[in-house]
C-alpha cells in the first residue's frame, strides 16, 4: 500500500520542543504536589529499559501502573477540576512550544509514545485528525496501550496496513528506526 504524500511525524522533540508528557507532569505537580511521587519510579523503569536491564513488557507494566496511579490521583484531586481541564489549560500555556517549521495538514499522522489524552488536544488545535499514541481509558485511568519502541511500527501497521509505505517520516530519534525503514524519505 502506498500512501501517496503520507506524512508521519514523531511528536516530542520533533514537532514539540521538549517532552510534552514530562512538561505536563511538572505542570500538574504545580497544581497538586502529590504528583511528584510518581516521577522517580517512571524514570527508574525508563532507565532500566534503556540500559537493557528491563524488557519492554516490564517497562510497559511499570509505566502503566505508575501512570494509572498518577492520573487517578489527579482525577481525585480537589486542586484539579478534571484531568481533561488540566490538559486543556496545559496546552493553553505550552502550545507555543510547537515548533514553527511544522505546517500541519489535516491528513498528517502524529505518532508518539505520549498519551492520546494529552497529545490529542494538541492535534485538535493543530487540525490534525490522525493520532497514533499510547492510550489511556479515561474512565479507569488505566494505560491500555503503550506506543513505545517497536510498538510504534506494530500499531502503525495495524491501523494503516501491513504494507503501508510512508512518503515522509520526521523524527528526532534513532529509536524510531522501524518507522524510518517504512519511509521513502526520513528526516531527523
Feature map (PLM): residue ranges:
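Active-site neighborhood of HAD-like aspartate-dependent phosphohydrolases
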Residues: 1-54
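Solvent-exposed, non-transmembrane amphipathic alpha-helical segments
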Residues: 33-36, 41-48, 63, 103, ...
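Metal-dependent phosphoesterase signature
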Residues: 59-98
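A general boundary/transition motif marking the beginning of the first structured unit of a protein
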Residues: 12, 51-54, 71-78, 90, ...
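A structural signal for alpha-helix termini and helix-coil/disorder junctions
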Residues: 30-31, 49, 53, 69, ...
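Short, compositionally biased "basic patch" segments
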Residues: 45-73, 123-126, 130-131
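C-terminal cap/substrate-recognition subdomain and adjoining C-terminal extension
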Residues: 2, 83-188
